[in-house]
Amino acid sequence: MARRTVLVTGVNGFIGSHAARAFHGRGDVVRGLVRQGSDRRLLGDLPLDLRHGDITDRASLDAAMPGVDVVVHLAGLASDHGPWERFHAVNVVGTQLLAASAHAHGVRRFVHVSSASLHGFAGRRHMTEDMPMPVSPYAYVESKRQAEQWLWQWSQTSGLPTVVIRPGNVFGPDDHTFLLQYVAAIRNGQGGYIGGGRAWTCPTYVENLTAALWLAAEHPAAVGEAFLVTDGLDIDWRTFTERLCEALGLRRPRLSIPYWLGMALATALEGGYRLVGARRAPLLTRYRIQNGGRDYHFSIDKIRRVLGFVPPFDLATALQRTAASMATARPAAPGAASGDAVG
């Protein structure tokens, strides 16, 4: 069978670099879209066909697209802080330009990585793909919602074969954003829980996610469908944190604040940061408080049933691998942008 050429946007980011390894390991030719001068350390010596480009620049996308069979779209602005205009330009318009270029060049499948956060923080467990995706007060979430909504309409009119993946809270080796910040806070005695850590969460180990991405790019039944992807666990934040601390050899956090207090503090902090025009997010944001203080949990029954997905790594292995990578890692600034789409 002829080898496919898979274009991965955001290839030098956390999820993108893992996706590149996964597709290369299965025999695909991986073409990576990277911005000029961007950090490529996560790619190591992986043999890739790197192309300079930007998802907001149609000409650069057209230059990278000839010969591509599958697009895996991971590039985006992923942060809980920043102006709407930036999120719209990158996450909405960038997706539109990429999909249009893929269609113009005869791409056979377009795998769009969205976010489980589109379903909101409704305090529910076992949420499914057909549940509402309300307008969000958070620029990141709303931009991903609008991008996915547009993409479904475009795929119907253009005929572009499209699959959407909505991951939960992604973690794993080389994650220098949220999880590393959380661990740094625990090390410093500042980490803790919202409401005692009893809200259910949706850990999504990055190599489990890339296994789902491969199925989305390969399985004939995937086209035209959206799939939620997590590790499939019924787990709360306290249990996840305790398992994480055990893997890292850290003392478990003892601090906890009520949900209402967390929201009040986050609202005040965000208002103050906006007032002074701060570019970085405060340590507490409403997004983070809702993510950690309300049930935010999803069923993966659909992807199990339709694509035969089974998460290949259990939580113990995932945390061991993640802990090993954190020995020398330094956290990014709070609210830092990422080359990946995250939950």
Model-derived regions: residue spans:
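Conserved Rossmann-fold NAD(P)-dependent oxidoreductase catalytic core, especially the SDR/UDP-sugar
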Residues: 93, 97-139
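Glycine/proline-rich active-site loop of Rossmann-fold NAD(P)-dependent oxidoreductases
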Residues: 145, 158-160, 171-181, 207, ...
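Catalytic helix-loop patch of NAD(P)-dependent Rossmann-fold dehydrogenases
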Residues: 89, 123-170, 191-195
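Mid/C-terminal beta-alpha module of Rossmann-like enzyme folds, strongest
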Residues: 215, 219-283, 316, 320-323, ...
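NAD(P)H-binding glycine-rich loop region in Rossmannoid oxidoreductase-like domains
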Residues: 38-39, 48-92, 101, 118-121
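A conserved pocket-lining segment of Rossmann-fold NAD(P)-dependent short-chain dehydrogenase/reductase
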Residues: 132-134, 164, 184-204, 208, ...
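N-terminal Rossmann NAD(P)H-binding glycine-rich loop of SDR-like oxidoreductase domains
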Residues: 6-26
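Conserved C-terminal active-site "lid" loop/helix of NAD(P)H-dependent oxidoreductases
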Residues: 206, 242, 265-274, 279-309
